[in-house]
Amino acid sequence: MAFTGNFFCTSFKDELLEGVHDFRLTSGDVFKLALYTNSASFTAATTAYTATNEVTASGSYSAGGGTLTNVSPTVSGTTAFTDFADLTFTTATITARGALIYNTTPAHTYTNPTCVVLDFGSDRSSTAGDFTIVFPTADASNAIIRIA
């Protein structure tokens, strides 16, 4: 079974209420993005990072993925949101169908809890070049993580 859509992981919603994730730019947690092949099977029930079906290390992409740069959480109207800076893996030969965003330093006993499942809709590839994850605009309508 392949990716089936974009999801906030159900466990992530619970962990927000437990105070597990800190998205602040300074002194916040460390979040990573790992890339996966079309053989990966993730849904909203996904709870933690796994190396199963992760793309092979290439160029600047290594096992576990890349570290994300947080964009400080903010509020617009009644919507709170946060986002990440775009992430580029250089000189990489990669074919990925989707990604997981997960927390490597949670304020709890969880191990690498997942936050978001991203489905690219189809395979995306680079050959000895840049593989870039472009995050949406950090605003109340578009940010990757929004709570309305």
Model-derived regions: residue spans:
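Small cysteine-rich, disulfide-bonded extracellular modules of the LU/uPAR three-finger superfamily
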Residues: 1-97, 104-148
